[in-house]
């Protein structure tokens, strides 16, 4: 018997790992995956369309999904035949670097709203269906910073520690229902994610930050981390292989 095609919902597909993974699954030679590639802003879907090539509209469908909105998540899941999500890939997220006293509470809460609460909202919507069907796979893009902290990544690292604790706890329940939960913990990845990170760091208001901290941030952290990204950075495609 032929294996049933699995419905895969991927979040954060406008660039980086989400885009690479959606394309890789959609172009699977055995056509085992129907991919619902989602993003918050459909105007950013050009790169995905281009790379999906012939798989577009056959094995890959692009949908609008904002992980910070329950309504948006529900609409997206309701638009999938029988609401059947066999594999959920939670990938939407962004980083934040800099001295913690220079971050606004609004930007800190926005990061958690996406990186952590976004995952929680998706689970609330999709997990009960998976439990009913007694099958499913949840793949969560975490980070090596969900395992250990890093200078000037306090808030981002905290959001990933939250993701890790949530998933480790949920996995214990999921096992009883035949559902797998996988945490992927990449190190540095060279992508749009990293480019945006440095761009935003450059525009931080650092006027209230002491000289010593600024010195560590600019002359040590930024200089060093750029080198690390360049020397050790993986491509999004390499990370997609793991999935």
Outline where the language-model segments fall.
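N-terminal Rossmann NAD(P)H-binding glycine-rich loop of SDR-like oxidoreductase domains
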Residues: 14-16, 22
């Amino acid at each position: 018997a032929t294996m049933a095609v699995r419905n895969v919902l991927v979040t954060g597909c406008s660039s980086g790992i989400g885009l690479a993974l959606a394309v890789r699954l959609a172009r699977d030679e055995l056509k085992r995956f129907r991919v619902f590639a989602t993003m918050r802003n459909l105007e950013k879907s050009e790169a995905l369309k281009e790379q999906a090539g012939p798989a577009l509209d056959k094995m890959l469908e692009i949908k609008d999904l904002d992980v910070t909105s329950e309504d948006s998540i529900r609409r997206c899941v309701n638009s999938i035949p029988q609401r059947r999500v066999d594999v959920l890939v939670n990938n939407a997220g962004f980083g934040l670097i800099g001295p913690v006293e220079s971050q606004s509470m609004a930007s800190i809460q926005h990061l958690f709203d996406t990186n952590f609460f976004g995952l929680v909202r998706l689970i609330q919507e999709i997990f009960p269906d998976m439990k009913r069907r007694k099958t499913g796979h949840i793949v969560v893009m975490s980070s090596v910073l969900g395992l250990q902290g890093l200078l000037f990544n306090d808030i981002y690292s905290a959001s990933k520690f939250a993701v890790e604790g949530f998933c480790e706890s949920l996995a214990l329940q999921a096992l009883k229902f035949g559902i797998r939960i996988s945490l992927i913990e990449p190190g540095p990845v060279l992508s749009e994610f990293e480019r945006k990170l440095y761009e935003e760091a450059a525009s931080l208001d650092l006027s209230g930050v002491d000289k010593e901290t600024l010195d560590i941030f600019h002359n040590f952290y930024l200089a060093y981390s750029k080198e690390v990204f360049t020397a050790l950075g993986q491509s999004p495609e390499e990370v997609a292989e793991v999935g």
